[in-house]
C-alpha cells in the first residue's frame, strides 16, 4: 500500500485519525440494493481503495496530483475530460454525460462523489490511498463552516478548482457525498483531494492524491452506505428524504461529497464550473444547481465560499473544496451538483460563511460531533455542515444564495438539490419538516435522538465514531411512521382504529389493548349480567379457575356488585359493577400494554406517563385483594394483575375484555350447567360463589402469591368443608362476605343465607345426596337379599362385583346421574369440593374419596382401585397444600392431600361403589376377617359418614361412633338398612325385615326402627343411632328425590 500513497503531501489533516467506513446494515432495507449492495464499506484499514471505473485513460495528466494514479482513473472516473479546474474541484470527478447514464446503474452515484459512502466501487482496480485521519473533521477544512479562514494544513494549496463538475467548493454540500458514514472525519480537503500542492485550477494538478481516496471512500460508502443508509436510491418525497436523510448529520454532510444514491453518473458530480459536455439533464439536480446564480440548489449545506476569501462564484462552487481545502481561495464558483446533496440538513439554515472565513479545526462547534443523531434512517454521517458553513446543529450557515431545496429526483440519489431562493436557506425549510416529523414520533425516541443532536451542536471537534449510524435511526423510520400515528391516536385514549402492533420491530398486540378495552365495558357488561343472573357464582368460580378467560367481567360483576348482589340481582347492578371494573381495567391494561411496549420507545411519552400513573392502580388492586374480606374481591382484583396460567395470560392478551360474545358464550354454558345444580334455589347464587371461590382460592392464591383474602374468607371456607359445623352458618357467612366488603368472620344465619345458601349447598349437597342414595340403594339391596345369593354373588361376580350391585333397584339411574354430575364439575370448572386447578384441570385431594365419599372402604382397597385404573395421585405443592389446609382440610395429612384428577373420578367411581357393595355383603354375611372387622366396626362410621356427607343439608352433628362389639345384632341393622334403602328407592316401607329373620326380638326391634326411620325419612338407620336418628327427622330423601328429578 505504501507505493500507492499519493506522492503529494496530504497534510496532517489527511492523516488524522479517520474513522473506518463501515456499512451499517441496519438501514439497508431502505435503499435499493443496487445503490449500495455492490460494495458495502469494505474499507477496514487505513487505506481507501478507489476502484477505477474504466481502463486508465489519458486523464493521467488531469490526475497529475496523483501522479501514479491518474492512469488508474478511467474517463469514467474522471468523467469527460475534465477541464483542469473541473477535475480538481473538491477532488471529485464527474463522468461524461454519455458515460453517466450507462454507468449510472453501476456506480454513477458513487462516482459522482469520490468519497460518497454510498457510491459503488468502480469497476477499475481499486486504488488504496492512505486513510487520511482527520484530526479535523471535514468541517474544519471548510473555511465557510469554520469561518476560520485559510487552512492551516498544507491543504492551503489552492483547491478552488473552478471546475464545478468536481466537488464544488462553494457547494460543499453538493460536493460532499454522504461519504463518510462511519466517520465524517474526511475533511473537505480529503474529499476534495488532499490539497494538491499544485494550483487548484490545474485540474490534473488539482486532483489531489486524496481524490482517488475520496472516490474510493465514496465508492465504499456508496455501495454499502447508500444501500444501507439511504432508504431508497431513488428520490423520495423531499419530506420523506428530509426525515430520513436530514435527520442524520451524516446524510446531510456526506451528501455534499456526492449523491449517496446513484444518479446519472455525471449528474451526481457537480458540473464543472464550465459544465462538462455531458447534458445537464444528466445531473440529478436541475441545471440550476450548476449555475452560480442557482447555487442555492446545493442542498443542505450551502456551498461555502472557498476558504479564505474565495468569494464569488468560486465561493459557491468550491464550497466543499474550500471547506476542506483552505487553498480554495482561488476556486472558481462552482455550482453544487444537483444530486449530490439530496438530503437537506436538519440543522437550521446554514448561514453562508463569508468566503474569507478561515478553515480551522476549531470549527468543531460547527462540526456535529455526532452525525448519527441527525440520521433518522441513514447511517450517513452528513459531511459536517460546517463544511458547508454550518453543521446541522452547529449553526454554521452556508451562503443562503446557495441554499438548495431537496427535490425528489429520479436519479439514484434520493433527493436532488433544487435551487432555493437565495433568501430561503435550504436547510432551514428542510429541518422544520424533519423536526416536525421527528417530534411526532420522537417522544419515545427523543432521548436517543436529542442526545446525538446535542453532541452535534456541541462545539468540541467532530469525533467521528466508527459507526456514525444514528443511535435510534435504523429502527426509527418505521417507528417514526408508526409513532407519528401512535402518539396522536393515543392522545385520544379510544383510538378510532387499533394502532400498529409493531413495536421495536417486534409484533405485539399490546397497542391493541387500549383499543380493545374501550368497547370492553359495554360488551362485557351485557354478557356479564346475563351470566350473573343464571348463576353468577359458577361464573365467578369458573372465571377465576380459567384465569379470567373472558368471564372476568362476570367475576368482576359479582364481586363488584357485592353490595348490590344480595338485594339486587338485576342486570343494572351487575352492569354498573362491571363497568366500573372495566373502566378501571382498561387504564390498567393500557398501562400494562404501555409497560410492555415501553422498552420499544415506540410508545408515546404521554402513554408512558399514563402507564406509570395507572400502575399504582394495579398495585392497589393487588394489595386490596388480599385485604378485602370477601373472596369475590380477590377474584375481581386478581384477574387483572395476575394469571392462573399461561392460558389465562394468553386469553387476556388476545381477548382483552373485548369479546362480548365470549362472555356470552362462556357464561351461557355456565348458566345452563348451573341451573341443574342450583335448582333447589336458583336465585341465591352469591352464597355458592363465596364457597366456590373459597374452594378455588387455594390455587388462585398460590399462583398469585397473594395472601388469602382475609380470615372471613377462610372462616367461610372452613365451615363448608367441615360437616360438624352447621352448614347454615357457613352459607350465611358466604353471602355476607360476598355482599359485604367488611369481613364477616362470624357465620350469621340470616334471611340472606336461606336464599343464597341453597345454591352453594346445591352443588355439594346434590352430589353428596346422590352418593348417599347410591350407597343406600346398594346397602339396601344387600340387606334384603338372602345370604345364599349374596355368597353366590361374591363367588361369581367380578373382582368388584359390579354385575351384582348394578342390578340393585334404582342404582343404575342414580349412578348415571352422579357420573354426569362429576363430568359437569370437570367441564364447567365448578367443583363444590376443595380442589386445585392446574393448567385448567381440576384436581381434588384424595381425601375426598377416602374420607368423605367412601369412608368405610379401607385405604388400601381404594389404592388398589386406583392402581387398576392406572390413576396417578399427584403431590401438592407447598402452597397448594397450605391453601387447602387453610381453606377446607385443616387436619389432613400430606398423604391425604395428594391430588386426583377430577376427570378421572368418573372412571374409578363405579369400582369404588363395587368395593362398597362387597363390604356390605361381607358385613351382611357376618364374614368378619380383620378387614371385615374393621369394615363392620366402621359400619356405624359409614352410616355416620354418609349422613356426614349430607351433614350440610341435615345440619345435624355427626352421630357417635359405636364400637363393633355387637356382632349378633349386625345382621339386623343390615336388614334395616336394606329396608331403608329399598324405601328410599321407592320400595314398600318395611318389607325388608322379613328378608332374613335373625330372631323374633331383633326382628321386632328392627321393624320398629325401620318404621320410625321411614317416617322420619332417614335412608340409613343404624344400630347405634336408633335412639337419636329417629328423633331427628331429616328431609334428606326428599332432597335427594327432588334433586334427582331436577337432574
UniProtKB/Swiss-Prot annotation:
Location of region: Disordered: 172-208, 236-283, 448-469, 482-504, 519-567, 668-690, 714-763, 931-1004, 1021-1047
Annotated Pfam families: DUF5525
Intrachain S-S bonds: none
Residues that bear N6-acetyllysine: 17
Compositionally biased tracts (Low complexity): 729-741, 751-762, 978-996
Modification Phosphothreonine occurs at: 397
One cellular component term from this protein's GO annotations in UniProt: cytosol
Record-linked InterPro entries: DUF5525
The keyword Acetylation appears for this protein: yes
Keyword hit for Chloroplast: no
Biased composition annotated in UniProt, kind: Polar residues: 237-254
Bias (Pro residues) ranges: 268-283
List of residues that carry Phosphoserine: 208, 299, 391, 455, 496-497, 936, 956, 988, 996
Keywords carried by this UniProt record: Acetylation, Phosphoprotein
Protein name in UniProt: Uncharacterized protein C15orf39
Record lineage: Eukaryota, Metazoa, Chordata, Craniata, Vertebrata
Name of the gene this protein is made from: C15orf39
Amino acid at each position: 500500500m505504501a507505493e500507492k500513497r499519493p506522492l503529494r503531501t496530504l497534510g496532517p489533516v489527511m492523516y488524522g485519525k479517520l474513522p473506518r467506513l463501515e456499512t451499517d446494515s441496519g438501514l439497508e432495507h431502505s435503499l435499493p440494493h443496487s445503490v449500495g449492495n455492490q460494495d458495502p464499506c469494505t474499507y477496514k484499514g487505513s487505506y481507501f481503495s478507489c476502484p477505477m471505473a474504466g481502463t486508465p485513460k489519458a486523464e493521467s495528466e488531469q490526475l497529475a496530483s496523483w501522479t501514479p494514479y491518474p492512469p488508474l482513473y478511467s474517463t469514467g472516473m474522471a468523467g469527460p475530460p475534465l477541464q483542469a479546474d473541473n477535475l480538481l474541484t473538491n477532488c471529485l470527478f464527474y463522468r461524461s454525460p454519455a458515460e453517466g447514464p450507462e454507468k449510472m446503474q453501476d456506480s454513477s452515484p458513487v462516482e459522482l462523489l469520490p468519497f460518497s459512502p454510498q457510491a459503488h466501487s468502480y469497476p477499475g482496480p481499486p486504488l488504496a490511498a492512505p486513510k487520511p485521519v482527520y484530526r479535523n473533521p471535514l468541517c474544519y477544512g471548510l473555511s465557510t463552516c469554520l469561518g476560520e479562514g485559510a487552512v492551516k494544513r498544507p491543504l492551503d494549496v489552492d483547491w478552488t478548482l473552478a471546475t464545478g463538475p468536481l466537488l464544488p467548493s462553494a457547494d460543499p454540500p453538493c460536493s460532499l457525498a454522504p461519504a463518510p458514514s462511519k466517520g465524517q472525519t474526511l475533511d473537505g480537503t480529503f474529499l476534495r483531494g488532499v490539497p494538491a500542492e499544485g494550483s487548484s485550477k490545474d485540474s490534473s494538478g488539482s486532483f489531489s492524491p486524496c481524490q482517488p481516496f475520496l472516490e474510493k471512500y465514496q465508492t465504499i460508502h456508496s455501495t454499502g452506505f447508500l444501500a444501507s443508509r439511504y432508504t431508497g436510491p431513488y428520490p423520495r418525497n423531499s419530506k420523506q428524504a428530509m426525515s430520513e436523510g436530514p435527520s442524520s448529520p451524516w446524510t446531510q454532510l456526506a451528501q455534499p461529497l456526492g449523491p449517496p444514491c446513484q444518479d446519472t453518473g455525471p449528474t451526481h458530480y457537480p458540473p464543472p464550473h464550465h459544465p462538462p459536455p455531458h447534458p445537464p439533464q444528466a445531473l440529478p439536480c436541475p441545471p440550476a444547481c450548476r449555475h452560480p446564480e442557482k447555487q442555492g440548489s446545493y442542498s443542505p449545506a450551502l456551498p461555502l465560499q472557498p476558504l479564505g476569501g474565495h468569494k464569488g462564484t468560486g465561493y459557491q462552487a468550491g464550497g466543499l473544496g474550500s471547506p476542506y481545502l483552505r487553498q480554495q481561495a482561488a476556486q472558481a464558483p462552482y455550482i453544487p451538483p444537483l444530486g449530490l446533496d439530496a438530503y437537506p440538513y436538519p440543522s437550521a439554515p446554514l448561514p453562508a460563511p463569508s468566503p474569507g472565513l478561515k478553515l480551522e479545526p476549531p470549527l468543531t462547534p460547527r462540526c456535529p460531533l455526532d452525525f448519527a443523531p441527525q440520521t433518522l434512517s441513514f447511517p450517513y454521517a452528513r459531511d459536517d455542515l460546517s463544511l458547508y458553513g454550518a453543521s446541522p446543529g452547529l449553526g454554521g450557515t452556508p451562503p443562503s444564495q446557495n441554499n438548495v431545496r431537496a427535490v425528489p429526483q429520479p436519479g439514484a440519489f434520493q433527493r436532488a438539490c433544487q435551487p432555493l431562493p437565495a433568501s430561503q436557506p435550504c436547510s432551514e425549510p428542510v429541518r422544520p419538516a424533519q423536526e416536525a416529523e421527528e417530534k411526532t414520533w420522537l417522544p419515545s425516541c427523543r432521548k436517543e435522538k436529542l442526545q446525538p443532536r446535542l453532541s452535534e451542536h456541541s462545539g468540541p471537534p467532530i469525533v467521528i465514531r466508527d459507526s456514525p449510524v444514528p443511535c435510534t435511526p435504523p429502527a426509527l423510520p418505521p417507528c417514526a411512521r408508526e409513532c407519528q400515528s401512535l402518539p396522536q391516536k393515543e392522545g385520544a385514549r379510544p383510538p378510532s382504529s387499533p394502532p400498529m402492533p409493531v413495536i421495536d420491530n417486534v409484533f405485539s398486540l399490546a397497542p391493541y389493548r387500549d383499543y380493545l378495552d374501550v368497547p370492553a365495558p359495554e360488551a362485557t357488561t351485557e354478557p356479564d349480567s346475563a351470566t350473573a343472573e343464571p348463576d353468577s357464582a359458577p361464573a365467578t368460580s369458573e372465571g377465576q379457575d380459567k384465569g379470567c378467560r373472558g368471564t372476568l367481567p362476570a367475576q368482576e360483576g359479582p364481586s363488584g356488585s357485592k353490595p348490590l348482589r344480595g338485594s339486587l340481582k338485576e342486570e343494572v347492578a351487575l352492569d354498573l359493577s362491571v363497568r366500573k371494573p372495566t373502566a378501571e381495567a382498561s387504564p390498567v391494561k393500557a398501562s400494562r400494554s404501555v409497560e410492555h411496549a415501553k422498552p420499544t420507545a415506540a410508545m408515546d411519552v404521554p402513554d408512558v406517563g399514563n402507564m406509570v400513573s395507572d400502575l399504582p392502580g394495579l398495585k392497589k388492586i393487588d394489595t386490596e385483594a388480599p385485604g378485602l374480606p370477601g373472596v369475590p374481591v380477590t377474584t375481581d382484583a386478581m384477574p387483572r394483575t395476575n394469571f392462573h396460567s399461561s392460558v389465562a395470560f394468553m386469553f387476556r392478551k388476545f381477548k382483552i375484555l373485548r369479546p362480548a360474545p365470549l362472555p356470552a358464550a362462556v357464561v351461557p354454558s355456565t348458566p345452563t350447567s348451573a341451573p341443574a345444580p342450583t335448582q333447589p334455589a336458583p336465585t341465591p347464587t352469591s352464597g355458592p360463589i363465596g364457597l366456590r371461590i373459597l374452594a378455588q382460592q387455594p390455587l388462585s392464591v398460590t399462583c398469585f402469591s397473594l395472601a388469602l383474602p382475609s380470615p372471613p374468607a377462610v372462616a367461610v371456607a372452613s365451615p363448608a368443608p367441615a360437616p360438624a359445623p352447621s352448614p347454615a352458618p357457613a352459607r350465611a357467612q358466604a353471602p355476607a362476605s360476598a355482599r359485604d366488603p367488611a369481613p364477616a368472620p362470624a357465620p350469621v344465619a340470616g334471611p340472606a343465607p336461606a336464599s343464597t345458601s341453597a345454591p352453594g349447598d346445591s352443588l355439594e349437597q346434590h352430589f353428596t345426596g346422590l352418593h348417599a342414595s347410591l350407597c343406600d340403594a346398594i346397602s339396601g339391596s344387600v340387606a334384603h337379599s338372602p345370604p345364599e345369593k349374596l355368597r353366590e354373588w361374591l363367588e361369581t361376580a367380578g373382582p368388584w362385583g359390579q354385575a351384582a350391585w348394578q342390578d340393585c333397584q334404582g342404582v343404575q339411574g342414580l349412578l348415571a346421574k352422579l357420573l354426569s354430575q362429576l363430568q359437569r364439575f370437570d367441564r364447567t370448572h365448578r367443583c363444590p369440593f376443595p380442589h386445585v386447578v392446574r393448567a385448567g384441570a381440576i384436581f381434588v385431594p384424595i381425601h375426598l374419596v377416602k374420607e368423605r365419599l367412601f369412608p368405610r372402604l379401607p385405604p388400601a382397597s381404594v389404592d388398589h382401585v386406583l392402581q387398576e385404573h392406572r390413576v396417578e395421585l399427584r403431590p401438592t405443592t407447598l402452597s397448594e397444600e397450605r391453601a387447602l389446609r387453610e381453606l377446607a382440610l385443616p387436619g389432613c395429612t400430606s398423604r391425604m392431600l395428594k391430588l386426583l384428577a377430577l376427570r378421572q373420578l368418573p372412571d374409578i367411581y363405579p369400582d369404588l361403589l363395587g368395593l362398597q357393595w362387597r363390604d356390605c355383603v361381607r358385613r351382611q354375611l357376618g364374614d368378619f376377617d380383620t378387614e371385615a372387622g374393621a369394615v363392620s366396626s366402621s359400619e356405624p362410621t359409614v352410616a355416620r359418614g354418609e349422613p356426614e356427607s349430607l351433614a350440610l343439608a341435615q345440619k345435624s352433628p355427626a352421630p357417635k361412633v359405636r364400637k363393633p362389639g355387637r356382632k349378633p345384632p349386625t345382621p339386623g341393622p343390615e336388614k334395616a338398612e336394606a329396608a331403608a334403602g329399598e324405601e328410599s328407592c321407592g320400595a314398600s316401607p318395611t318389607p325388608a325385615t322379613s328378608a332374613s329373620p335373625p330372631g323374633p326380638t331383633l326382628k321386632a326391634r328392627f321393624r320398629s326402627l325401620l318404621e320410625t326411620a321411614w317416617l322420619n325419612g332417614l335412608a340409613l338407620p343404624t344400630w347405634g343411632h336408633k335412639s337419636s336418628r329417629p328423633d331427628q327427622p331429616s328431609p334428606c330423601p326428599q332432597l335427594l328425590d327432588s334433586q334427582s328429578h331436577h337432574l
